[in-house]
Every structure is written in C-alpha cells, then in structure tokens.
Design a protein with these regions (language model features):
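Mature, structured domains of secreted/extracytosolic soluble proteins
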Residues: 3-940
Length: 940
C-alpha cells in the first residue's frame, strides 16, 4: 500500500517536510514584512519563491522597528531607504548557496570533495555586488593628500569603497573550537553580548536561539524548498571593511585622519566601462584603495617586496597613476601600510588560506588615547614636529603598521600575548585595553584605550627615519638590507654611527684601494669615490663613481666622473655587498649595557669592535667624540660626531664629514712596510709556504692588485689577530735549527713536472736521507715527502700566530654575567683558538690573551703527557709597544669579477689586527725541523 504522506511528493514533486519557498515561509510567519518589501522592491521575489538555492539571514519586524529608531544611516522609516541601502540590507544577508548553520564553517578539502575540512571557514561571499554601494564623494570629503589634488578642485566623483564584494563574517561553534577561540574571546568580540561558543554570530549579530544548549527553541536552519532561513536578533546593515569601521566611529577620528594619508583614488577603465554598460552612467568610476604592501590588484592579490625598490624599474613598486594628469607617482616603500584595510576580500600571507579561512585585525586607539600619548611618550615627536599632521609619513606608517595584524584567528584576546611588535617582542596589548570591538567583512577592529608604538621609535635606527631629509640614504640601507630587525633588539646595547646624506657622497670604493700616481717623486693615492644620492621621484638610491685624489692629511678631492652604477644584475649585487660591508662597520654592540661609548672612552678604552668584527677607534676631543676607521687611522683623519641621539637600546651618532671606513691595507702590505716584520714575512712567503695568494678558486681576486698585494688564505669572512715575532726571536729559532734558515727555505731552480729539485736533493744527500741503492723514482718520492713536511712545518708556524677574533690594546673587553644578566666582571683574559689544529684531538690549539688599556700578553700552549705531567709549560709573550707596531688594522678583500677597474664586486673581507710580540709562539715541544722530516721519512 502507498502511504498518504507520499501524496505531496506525487502531486508537487517535493516531500512535505521540505516546506514552502523562502518567500512563502516568510509570508506564513507573518512578522517579516520589511524583509518581504525588500525582496519585492529589489525584484528578488521570483528567485526566492521558485528558483535558486539561497541561505537568507532575516530579522523580524520588531528588530527593524528598533533599528529605525537607532541606526547610523539616519533612516527612521522604511520609506526613507534609498535603493543602494535596500540592496545592502538584503544582499549582504543572503548567500547564493543553501547552508545548514552548523556546516557553514566547513570547507571542501582540495583534491577530495567528499572530505570537508571541519571548522576552517569564517567568511563567505554574499549576494551583494560591489556596485550596490557606489558612493558620490564631494570634493570637501576627499582625503587631503597629493593623490587627490587633481580632484579636490573639481566636481564630485563616483567611487567604490572597494572593487571586491564584501563577504559575510561569521563566528560559528565549529570554527571557534577549531581555532581555540574561547567563550571570553567571543564575549569581547561581541562587546559582551555573547555568552557561549555554542552561539552563532553573523556580521556581529546573533542567530536567534543559536546558543540554546537543549536546542528546544531552534529558529535557524528553517528548511525551505529553495534553501534555508536563518533568523537573527538584529538587522544586518552591511559589511563594512576595517577602514570603514575606523571612519564610522567618531572616537577613532584621529586614527582615521592618519589613514587618509594612504588613500588613493584608483581609476580602472575596464571597471568603469562595465559599470556604464550595466547602469547607463557615463561618469568616471573610481575605487578607493589604501597604499599598502599587500592589496587587490584587479585580478588577485599583489604583494610588494622591499627588494623591488632597489631596482631602476618601476616594476614591483607601488605606482599611482593619475588618470587626469597622466602623472605616475612611485609611493615609497616606507609609506605603505602592512595591508590594505579597505580590501573587502583581504587574504593573509598564509598560502594555504583563501578569503574564507581568516581575516585581518587592526588595533586602533581612541582620540583621547592618541592625545595622551602625544603629550606623554610621544612628546619627542611633538617637540620635533609640533603637530601630528607634520610628522613625516614614514614615521606614521611605522606607528600604524605595528597595529595592523595580518591574521585574526591567531591573535584573539586570549592570545594577545602572542601579538608581536616590529622587534618580534610582545606588543603589550591585553584584553583590559579593549574599549570596543567591531566585526568587519575583512577583519576585526579593536578600539583600545592606549597607543601601542613600534620598537623602532625607541631604537638607535629611529633617528635616521625621523630625520629623513638628512639621513634617508642610510635609513633606506638599514631598512632594505635587513639591518632594521637587528637594530630593534631591546636586549642589546648599541652605538650606531649614522652618516648624513652629505657623508654618503664620499664613499671610498675598496676595489680601487692601492691606486696611485707619482709626480716628481711624490706619490698620491687615487682611489675611486662612490657618490650616493636619493632619487625622490623613483624612490631609490642612485650611485655615481668618480676619480679622486687623497692628500697627505687624508683630504679627498673628487675628480672626473666615471659613470653611474645601476640597480640591476651584477651592479645591484655590487651595491648590496658594499652596503652590508659598510653597515657592519657602523654598528657597535656594547658588552656592558650600563656603559656608553663616552663612559668607556673616559675609562681609557679606545677601540670598539663592530658588528662585522672590524675595529673603530674612538677618542674624545674637546668633549666631542671622534671616530676613526682603519682608513682614517692610516690617514690621520678624524670624523667628529656632530649629534648624539640617546635611545632605549643605545645611542646614535650623526657624522657629516665622511663614513668611517675599514683599512685598505692587507696583512701582506702591512708586513712589507715594516722591516721589523721581515723575518715573519719570509716565513710566510717562501718556497715551502703557500699561505699567501692573489687569487682564490680562480674566481676571486685579492684587493690592492695595483700594488701586487696578496691575501692570507687562512682567513675567511671573519675577524682575526696576527702576532708577529721579532726578527731576533725568529733568528734564534733558526739558530737552534727549530726553523729552517732563509737559505734552506730557498729551493732554487726546481721543476714540479720533471721533479728536478737540486736544492732539496743536496739536503737529502747531506743528511743521508736517501737509502743505499735508491733509484731516481725513490729519491723523487723522498724529496716530495721532505717538501710536504717542510710545507706543513712552515704553515703550522704561521697558523699558530693567527687567532680567531680581533684583539687590541685598549679594546673594550667582553663581560661575564650572572644568571640575571648582570655584569660581574670584564673578560680581559680570554682563550682564543689559533688556526693550528691538534691532529690528535681535532681541536684548534688555543692561545691565552690578556689585554688592558695599555698592554697585552699572549701565552702559548701548555703540553702535558698522558699522565697529566707538564712537559712543556706555556710561555707568556708581550706585545711590543715601544716601536708602535701594535694595533695595526688590516682588511683583506676578495673581489669577484675584477676584469676591469670599475666592475669588481666585493665577495668577502677579513678584518685583522697585527701586533709585534717579543717571542715566538710554540704549540708544542721544540723539535728541530730535521727531526720532524726524519720522522716523516721513517728514519730513526
């Protein structure tokens, strides 16, 4: 028999439980006349009566009556609603698919449509169109910035608040649970209206009875034949984006005024033509954008990378094109917001996310909070600029960006401790700071009662940003070459040397060190000079190379222009490596956080180790600090600090004369210049030692090639100390036959191909190292072993006189700290690794160095037998200070692509300090070199 309940299915083609259409159900309910009027007026009756598949969120007539009495639109009755307002009310409340409430937070997994991902979705597009809310903006409403200048003097314009449709934002139980969002979080997000994570909230409005634990009063998931009805407690007005939310609250008007700086009227011809075609309107149509590093570019997300601003091309930069004047403006990278707060369908940087999965977040202080900050912690800005409007946009950008958080779900109030500032340290926001929350279509705005500032404002890098007119070149380098995060650390104490734009016009090109001319027996240095300037129109640093001359007092005279150094390919690499080398020489990390450079100098210290390992010499002349890099020391030239800026993590020093520059001399050149080093140089450079070279890997060339310099191949991209024994000390070892004599180190005429080596042959004969009856092949093998052993002896001798880490007399020492980080003592005595490796342990044999303001000693290795008995006690040697051969700074450069005089790119550099010592350093027990050779030959 057939059930009578199947009659509906037979007669209508639908089961009885499916119910009527959405439109009919609203009619039957009897208390949704306003929603029905909206449907009728917008021509949606047929869609919601018969066809389509929709989810409609509806508010009862009583909710509308309450809304007419209090709304932001100023509408007091239905008849006052404009057509765009009606579209916003209906279409923002409707989704073009049928969804059960509990399934709205699910998302179909990629690659397997049958396996939805639970609790992944918090936003969905609605039936709204971007054209539903075209706004007519009057000239006096336009933001007061340069991008609107051509329009403020004209007529009103039609503008979209965004070109992408505004999605619905919903907080549903599955999403809240999946992202560990607590009931207290939801309570704060809804301004204390929510009480349970079982509730469902859509655009800040609660779904009726959605939190009923017994589910006895269910007013959602009303099933209709063409979709679902979800009843909500209040009227869903629209889905404003975060930027609109800030502008809508008068108590955030100061912050909104700051956002005006970034507003850009973007004209899209295709969009305009489409609008005119559909709406029969010939007026130009603009889109309101906010200049940002992440924005919607017409076909998808666009991300601006800082490195794009290092190139000559405009590609990859944020370019505004005024359609009326056809003038292009490159908006500076440091004037771009973190993301566009007006992008309705904002997508974060998580590549696995779409607009559905997350949203953004803005922290916006009240007007009172801004005023209190301006008169308190921000007083230094007030003193500098007078009014907030006068504060340069790059500074304002840093302030706004630290309060723009790219993902919402990761940083809800219960996770505020994870909100980090630009130094990757806690921003400091707590739930108690929240005055009100706003849910937008692209994120949540937290209105707070205090201003959260970036770490940059307290860091040593800040003066360069704050004084852009005089230091924008060095700040661009700090920001562009990743030094800014390093300088933001509040756990370190810095001294940062900041060259002015004038100083940046006199940069010595290290690839040209060693160039000179001689006239009338007078030698004049002729290095190349790099002149850096900042092109405001292109928002990039430009560089020109010049010839120059340097007089005996270190004064540089700029000469003939050689050409520009561009921003592409190998030239960009050249510049970036030069920037890095320069910046590493301008940053000093002070070991004792309670000290300043001035205090150290007052205590007698003169040398400070830089971030890159080189040394800066600092003296006090008439109460002003004077800086000298290695080059300035060589040329007896001081660079005065003309301004000091005290910040939370150290002090910055403005220099205008020139940039402190590392030494131009290699170790080889330094040894050549002083006859007192001649014996050690012989030990370095002879027929048995190959530690010096002018090329590396057949690809890199040593610096100062014009004077045939060579580099110490033992060194890497680090800092070192070389101890040079006196000539007499080396001669004494030669006399003891511990080291070969100069004559023995000369192999004379030898041929590696034929293995003909008469000098070594004569030694082997004299010492009886050839066994009786040895043929020529055997003799050649013995000679090869002798050469190999002597090469090792000489290399090891040099290696034990070279240590990791530069150390100088008068250098600020490292410190010992307790468990709380408090300084307990200065580490004047330290053990450093030499370059000589212990073949048994594999470790580098140490040297013990003790250095003070006026002396230094070096103690060589103590050797013990297997039982722990000392068989060779360490010997302490003094650095000789009587002849001035100490604290000699050197720098060894390796250049890539040095085919001509102007295209060499710095590959790496080593910083070295050379000291003469009064004895020879021995890693082990003294052994005559002949005994070592005999052992290698197996001769007893």
């Amino acid at each position: 028999m057939q059930s009578c309940k199947d009659d509906d299915l037979i007669l209508t083609g639908q089961p009885s439980w499916l119910g009527n259409s959405i439109y009919e159900r609203l009619q039957d309910e009897g208390n949704y006349k306003y929603t029905l009027r909206l449907i009728d007026d917008l021509g949606e009756k047929d869609v919601l009566s018969h066809t389509g598949s929709r989810t409609l969120f509806v508010a009862a007539d009583s909710a509308y009556e309450a809304w007419f009495k209090d709304n932001k639109w100023g509408v007091s009755q239905y008849e006052d609603l404009t057509l765009p307002q009606k579209k916003l009310l209906l279409r923002n409340s409707m989704i073009d698919n049928a969804y059960l409430l509990e399934l709205m937070s699910n998302e179909t997994a990629e690659g397997d449509a049958a396996t939805p991902e639970w609790g992944r979705t918090m936003r969905r597009t609605t039936s709204a169109s971007a054209y539903d809310s075209v706004y007519v903006m009057q000239p006096d409403e336009m933001p007061d910035n340069a991008y609107w200048a051509s329009k403020r003097g004209g007529n009103a314009i039609r503008i979209l608040k965004d070109v992408t449709e505004a999605p619905m934002i919903h907080f549903l139980p599955a999403y809240l649970q999946n992202h560990k969002i607590t009931a207290e979080d939801l309570n704060l997000l809804t301004n204390h209206r929510a009480t349970s994570i079982n509730e469902a909230w859509v655009n800040g409005v609660k779904v009726v009875n959605s939190g009923d634990p017994d589910k006895k009063k269910i007013d959602y998931d009303v099933t209709c034949k063409n979709g679902y009805i979800q009843k909500v407690e209040r009227v869903i007005e629209s889905s404003p984006n975060m930027a609109q939310l800030v502008y809508q609250d008068d108590d955030m008007s100061t912050w909104a005024h700051l956002l005006d700086r970034y507003a850009v009227p973007y004209f899209d011809k295709t969009l305009w033509q489409d609008y005119n075609k559909n709406y029969k309107n010939n007026d130009s149509l603009f889109v309101l954008r906010y200049a940002a590093k992440s924005y919607y570019g017409g076909s998808g997300k666009v991300t601006i990378d800082r490195s794009n601003y290092d190139t000559s091309s405009d590609n990859g930069k944020y370019v505004y094109n005024d359609e009326r004047t056809n003038q292009k403006t490159v908006i500076p990278y440091d004037e771009l917001l973190r993301f566009d707060p007006g992008w309705n369908q904002y997508i974060d940087d998580n590549q696995q996310n779409t607009l559905h999965n997350d949203a953004g977040m803005m922290i916006v202080p009240t007007n009172q909070a801004v005023q209190e900050w301006w008169n308190g912690p921000g007083k230094s800005l007030q003193d500098e600029y007078g009014t907030l409007d006068n504060v340069p946009t790059p500074i304002v950008t840093e302030l706004i960006n630290v309060n723009m958080i790219p993902t919402f779900s990761t940083y809800v109030p219960s996770k505020f401790a994870s909100v980090l500032n630009d130094a990757k340290e806690p921003l400091g926001i707590t739930k108690n700071d929240i005055a009100q929350c706003y849910m937008g279509c692209n994120g949540v705005v937290y209105k707070v009662n205090k201003v959260f500032t970036p770490a940059l404002f307290a860091s040593v890098a800040y003066p360069a940003l704050a004084h852009a007119s005089t230091m924008n070149i060095i700040y661009s380098i700090i920001d562009g070459r990743t030094f800014k995060p390093y300088l933001l650390s509040m756990d370190s104490k810095y001294a940062l040397i900041l060259p002015s734009n004038n100083a940046m016009q006199l940069i010595l090109d290290p690839a040209s060190f060693g160039r000179s001319t001689t006239t009338d027996d007078v030698k004049t240095e002729t290095p190349y000079i790099l002149e850096f300037t900042f092109n405001k129109e292109k928002q990039q640093i430009e560089c020109v190379r010049y010839k120059s001359t340097v007089d005996e007092m270190g004064e540089i005279t700029k000469g003939e222009k050689l050409g520009e150094i561009g921003n592409t390919g190998s030239l960009l690499t050249f510049r970036n490596r030069l920037y890095d080398s320069m910046m590493n020489y301008l940053i000093i990390v002070l070991p004792d956080k309670d000290m300043t450079v001035e205090k150290y100098v007052k205590q007698g210290y003169k040398y400070f180790k830089t971030k890159g390992g080189g040394l800066i010499k600092v003296t006090d002349v008439g109460g002003k600090l004077q800086f000298q890099g290695g080059w300035q020391v060589e040329h007896n030239r001081n660079i005065p600090a003309v301004e000091r800026y005290d910040m939370d993590n150290g002090s910055s020093y403005l220099v205008e004369d020139m940039v402190p520059t590392a030494s131009q001399k290699s170790v080889y050149i330094t040894l050549q210049e002083h006859p007192e080093f001649s014996k050690f140089l012989t030990m370095m450079e002879n027929d048995y030692n190959n530690v010096l070279a002018n090329t590396l890997s057949n690809k890199y060339t040593a610096g100062q090639s014009w004077v045939s310099s060579k580099n110490l191949r033992l060194l890497d991209n680090y800092n070192y100390t070389v101890y040079v024994p006196t000539n007499e000390a080396i001669e004494a070892l030669q006399a003891e036959k511990i080291l070969p004599t100069d004559e023995e180190l000369d192999r004379g005429d030898f041929d590696t191909k034929t293995k003909n080596d008469p000098k070594v042959d004569s030694i082997c004969i004299a010492e009886g190292w050839y066994p009786d009856g040895a043929n020529e092949t055997k003799k050649a093998d013995i000679r090869a072993k002798v050469v190999e052993t002597l090469t090792t002896i000489m290399s090891d001798f040099i290696r034990y006189h070279v240590q990791d880490h530069s150390v100088a007399i008068g250098m600020v020492p490292d410190v010992e700290v307790d468990e709380n980080g408090n300084v307990t003592s200065y580490k004047n005595k330290t053990s450093f690794e030499s370059m000589k490796r212990d073949l048994e342990t594999g470790r580098f044999i140490p040297l013990e160095v003790n250095y003070t303001n006026n002396s230094m000693t070096v103690k060589d290795n103590t050797v013990k037998d297997a039982n722990g008995n000392v068989i060779k006690a360490g010997v302490t040697h003094n650095v000789v200070t009587s002849n001035g051969l100490y604290n000699l700074q050197c720098r060894e450069y390796w250049f890539e692509g040095k085919n001509t005089e102007v295209n060499a790119s710095l590959f790496m550099a080593s910083d070295v300090v050379v000291h003469q010592i009064d004895g020879v350093l021995l890693p082990g027990v003294k052994r005559p070199w002949r005994d070592i050779v005999k052992e290698a030959l197996g001769i007893e």
